[in-house]
UniProtKB/Swiss-Prot annotation:
InterPro entries: Ribosomal_uL16, Ribosomal_uL16_bact-type, Ribosomal_uL16_CS, Ribosomal_uL16_dom, Ribosomal_uL16_sf. Binds 23S rRNA and is also seen to make contacts with the A and possibly P site tRNAs. Part of the 50S ribosomal subunit. This is Large ribosomal subunit protein uL16. GO terms for cellular component: ribonucleoprotein complex; ribosome. GO terms for biological process: translation. Keywords: Ribonucleoprotein, Ribosomal protein, RNA-binding, rRNA-binding, tRNA-binding. GO terms for molecular function: rRNA binding; structural constituent of ribosome; tRNA binding. Residues 138-160 are annotated as: Disordered. The keyword Transferase does not apply.
């Protein structure tokens, strides 16, 4: 399972999850991705379970990129202990996820959109946050250029 090799401090505050993801919110490696819709903590076990589900489904077809890393320790006290006597020991690691964050990416020549969608759906069940499937649109640049050309033409027509 994923966890940092070493950290500066053993224990962290829980913190607050406000706003949307400003980093890691675009597809960088593959053609298809799983994007978070709400905020939450994703544990190292959940990441590993999702990864296994996707890998089993695509077999050896493509490649999977994990875009989140559990770098926040969550501490817990032993059961039936009295209040006080300090903060508990780190029990597991979580990745803080905000809306818009890309969790997993998938790509490769053998991967079709249907296969990627089904693999991501299997991974989705293992995660505590609501997610959606997104893909890179290959004709993304062409329509935007046409719109600017059309808008320039319409502006010229209006001037005349």
């Amino acid at each position: 399972m994923l966890s940092p090799k070493r950290t500066k401090f053993r224990k962290q505050h829980r913190g607050r999850m406000r706003g949307v993801a400003s980093k890691g919110n675009t597809i960088a490696f593959g053609q298809f991705a799983l994007q978070a819709q709400d905020c939450g903590w994703v544990t190292a076990r959940q990441i590993e379970a999702s990864r296994r589900a996707m890998t089993r489904y695509i077999k050896r077809g493509g490649q999977i990129w994990i875009r989140i890393f559990p770098d926040k320790p969550v501490t817990m006290r032993p059961a039936e202990t009295r209040m006080g006597s300090g903060k508990g020991n780190p029990e597991f690691w979580v990745a803080v996820v905000k809306p818009g964050r890309i969790l997993f990416e998938m790509g490769g020549e053998d991967i079709t959109e249907e296969v990627a969608k089904e693999a991501m759906r299997l991974a989705q069940y293992k995660l505590p946050v609501k997610t959606k499937f997104i893909s890179i649109d290959k004709n993304l640049e062409a329509p935007s250029q046409e719109k600017t050309k059309n808008s320039k033409k319409s502006q010229e027509e209006v001037k005349q």
